[in-house]
A protein has these predicted regions:
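C-terminal motif of bacterial Sec signal peptides marking the signal peptidase cleavage site
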Residues: 17-21
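Bacterial signal peptide processing site
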Residues: 23-25
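Mature, Sec-exported extracytoplasmic domains of Gram-positive
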Residues: 27-204
Length: 204
């Protein structure tokens, strides 16, 4: 329960700082530049945002900024690996009312590195999903995330983050990057794996 409450608090803070952080001004040192059109990329917190997170003494969330044209809806999906294939285990959908949309996604994690919650903000508002902590724990774990700007292609999922957990201390983990994990789930040998994607879709 403590993790859930902490995740909710952190996501609320992320939503607050996201409302004004996706704009470009002449003062480059105190603002976050938006990505190029039809691009999603890792975001960098400005100093004021970092200071707010330090007050909470919690792990910094993983942030992605995006800018897209021609999409009518986007959705974030959470997948869990089962029998060599990705199976949906959660997510959220948001309609797009503007021809050009800018927004930010924030992912938060528990002490063991596992996914705890997600918030996403666009020009229409903010929404969030929180996940109860799992009862099972892993002796070792690893995670990877998208590190470079990625071109947004409508109707094609973009993998943002992948997690791998092992139940045995001696087990070796091959931590594939999210894009490889999305396309090749059959190669993953970990005891547990989770993936988060975002998809932007056109009308019709």
């Amino acid at each position: 329960m403590k993790l859930r409450k902490l995740s909710a608090l952190l996501l609320t803070l992320c939503c607050a700082v996201m409302l004004g952080s996706c704009k470009v001004t002449e003062t480059a040192t105190t603002t976050t530049a938006v990505p190029s059109k039809n691009t999603i990329q890792p975001a960098v917190l400005i100093q004021e945002e970092s200071n707010l997170l330090e007050l909470l003494d919690v792990q910094q969330p993983m942030l992605f900024d995006f800018s897209v044209e021609g999409a009518s809806i986007y959705w974030v999906e959470i997948f869990t690996l089962q029998d060599g294939a990705w199976q949906p285990s959660g997510g959220s959908t948001s309609p797009i009312d503007e021809p050009d949309l800018r927004g930010r996604i924030a992912l938060t994690f528990g002490e063991d590195g596992r996914f705890a919650g997600i918030a996403f903000q666009d020009e229409d508002g903010v929404s969030r999903i929180s996940q109860d902590p799992e009862t099972s724990a892993f002796v070792s774990h690893a995670s990877t995330s998208a590190a470079d700007p990625i071109e947004i292609v409508l109707d094609e999922p973009i993998a943002l983050w992948a997690y791998y957990g092992e139940q045995e201390a001696a087990a070796s983990t091959t931590a594939y990057f999210p894009d490889h994990a999305l396309q090749n789930p059959q190669e993953i040998q970990s005891d547990f794996a989770q993936l988060i994607t975002i998809t932007f879709a056109a009308a019709g």
